[in-house]
């Protein structure tokens, strides 16, 4: 190969190859994603609409299920995003699959980037489609089941930050809060991408377990040190306490994005190292 790092034509052929080989597995995962979200949204909608048939809900302008749908979206995003990331290097589980990957005429970066693209960018696109389809399924089912409830509508994703609309349920009052949550999602997702490179087998469980233990020890140590060395009779002002909420959110958002970039880059070098070891 003349270009030993990245070639667009070669990368396109690699993506096409991966898409042809993995389309059945990806389609099955998309159907599972849609099915799980549909079952949960329809189940909660039944609980609300079936037990709440008063005059107020029949003529209200806000769907009473929207608050749950908004929160469920975040849980789905983090949960399924982590699960998708844990499948990034699933083709490296067995010795035969690793040897097959080595035989592909592409650089380590192209192989890693093609897998990262599917588990990160393509997943977000398909997740939004599956979520909207699941929500529209809920709306169709209950508009026929409860025709008197005029407020049954699909949840508008812009309702999180649009403070001018009285019809929307507010999860975040400010845009900077939503940006921070998305940055946090990228960081969490990057941990599972890194875990997939380190542990191709049972990646999700191993990454979740190790991450939980590290987080518990880290925050436990911080709390213990603060409790040991702080004087409860005194009040301490930190530099962050003088910042506005928007400034603090911006800082933590930048740190989360930098952490995600670090994990993605570290995952690439770990993947490249594993390929070198396999060739030896």
Predicted regions and their residues:
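Hydrophobic alpha-helical transmembrane segments of membrane proteins
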Residues: 1-99, 108-280
């Amino acid at each position: 190969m003349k270009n030993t790092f990245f070639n667009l034509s070669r990368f396109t052929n690699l993506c096409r190859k991966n898409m042809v080989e993995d389309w059945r597995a990806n389609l099955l995962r998309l159907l599972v994603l849609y099915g799980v979200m549909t079952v949960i949204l329809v189940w909660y909608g039944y609980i609300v609409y079936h037990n709440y048939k008063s005059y107020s809900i029949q003529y209200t302008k806000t769907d009473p299920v929207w608050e749950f749908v908004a929160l469920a979206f975040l849980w789905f995003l983090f949960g399924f995003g982590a699960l998708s990331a844990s499948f990034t290097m699933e083709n490296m589980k067995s010795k035969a699959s690793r040897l097959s990957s080595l035989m592909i005429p592409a650089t380590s970066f192209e192989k890693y980037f093609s897998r990262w693209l599917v588990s990160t960018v393509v997943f977000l696109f398909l997740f939004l489609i599956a979520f909207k389809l699941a929500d529209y399924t809920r709306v169709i089912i209950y508009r026929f089941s409860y025709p008197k409830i005029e407020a049954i509508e699909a949840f508008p994703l812009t309702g999180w930050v649009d403070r001018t609309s009285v019809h929307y349920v507010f999860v975040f009052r400010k845009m900077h809060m939503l940006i921070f949550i998305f940055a946090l999602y990228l960081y969490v997702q990057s941990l599972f991408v890194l875990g997939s490179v380190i542990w191709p087998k049972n990646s999700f469980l191993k990454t979740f377990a190790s991450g939980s233990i590290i987080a518990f020890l880290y925050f436990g140590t911080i709390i213990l040190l603060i409790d040991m060395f702080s004087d409860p009779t005194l009040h301490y002002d930190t530099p962050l306490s003088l910042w506005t909420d928007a400034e603090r959110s911006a800082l933590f958002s930048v740190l989360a994005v930098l952490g995600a970039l670090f994990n993605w880059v570290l995952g690439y070098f770990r993947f490249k190292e594993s390929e070198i070891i396999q060739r030896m």
